[in-house]
């Protein structure tokens, strides 16, 4: 719960795909229906479950696209790295 809040704060309570206007973004400053996504799924990386380098704030649409593999892992990972450097 605390980690989820921290990641949303790090990401300014905005979907990190929408803010970059990628993958069918409908609204750049999207703060609705935000979820914290594990870039590498928990079943593949239990040890990264709470690691900031594996977590990103996404809207429900982009979260679903990531889960379906429609947004490449490497691209999501690069956004996370960028966010952690701020």
Predicted regions and their residues:
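Short cysteine-rich loop/turn motifs with clustered Cys
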Residues: 1-35, 59-61
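Generic alpha-helical secondary structure signal
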Residues: 2-5, 53, 74
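Short Cys/His-centered divalent metal-binding micro-motifs
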Residues: 20-25, 55-77
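Short cysteine/histidine-rich zinc-coordinating motifs and their immediately flanking basic loops
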Residues: 26-41, 70-76
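Compositionally biased, intrinsically disordered low-complexity segments enriched
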Residues: 40, 64-65, 85
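Short linker/helix segments within small regulatory modules
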Residues: 40-55
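Charge-dense (acidic/basic), low-complexity helical/coil segments
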Residues: 76-86
């Amino acid at each position: 719960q605390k980690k989820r809040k921290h990641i949303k704060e790090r990401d300014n309570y905005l979907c990190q795909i929408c803010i970059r206007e990628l993958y069918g973004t409908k609204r750049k400053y999207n703060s609705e229906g935000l979820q914290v996504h594990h870039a590498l799924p928990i079943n593949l990386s239990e040890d990264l479950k709470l690691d900031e380098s594996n977590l990103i704030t996404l809207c429900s649409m982009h979260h679903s696209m990531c889960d379906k593999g429609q947004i490449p892992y490497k691209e999501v990972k690069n956004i996370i790295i960028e966010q952690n450097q701020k």
